[in-house]
């Protein structure tokens, strides 16, 4: 398949009036036909496609193209293109597009060399839909930067105001946190809000399972 054919197929797939029938839908044909195109070339075609569609009316097109980019990264992770995807979070302002992008990123395993600053910024967004999605997506990166972005929310003490942020942050820290995070999480183990309490307790348990050699060092004095 030539680049021109590929872009035409993208045009069909991202069109608002695209065909829905599974066997004939552009989305289905997209994943069947491009096998003859090198994956490295696919990435650059997608990036160019996104960067050249900057108008407001192109929002839907970019959103669908991000879905394709996310699927391709899931199939063949390339740090350079993963970085491009994350950096694009700063270029979009539609909360539904950002939510969709974050959903794609959350399914990836972000390489350690990728800068997640734009993802961290989204985790403090004024838009709750974006903020909540971003906090959960931080779990895709096992980096200190990601952990610190999650700790920002776990350190909050107003559990009523930041209930959902704490629930999501506790859960994520359970998967990417280190032994030193146990004491931070234990601040919420006796929360009056059940979901905050349960996610904190589960996170502590999960970290201890992953770092058993350090678990005793993190045992609170009251537990001795």
Name every feature range the model reports, one short phrase each.
Residues 1-11, 36-53, 75-90, 110-124, ...:
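Amphipathic alpha-helical scaffolding segments comprising HEAT/armadillo-like alpha-solenoid repeats
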Residues 1-29:
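N-terminal "cap/leader" segments of large eukaryotic alpha-helical scaffolds
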Residues 15-17, 57-58, 93-94, 126-127, ...:
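Short inter-helical turns and helix N-cap capping residues of alpha-solenoid HEAT/ARM repeat scaffolds
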Residues 19-40, 60-76, 95-111, 129-143, ...:
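Structural detector for internal amphipathic alpha-helices that build alpha-solenoid repeat scaffolds
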Residues 14, 52-54, 59, 65, ...:
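Residue-identity detector for threonine
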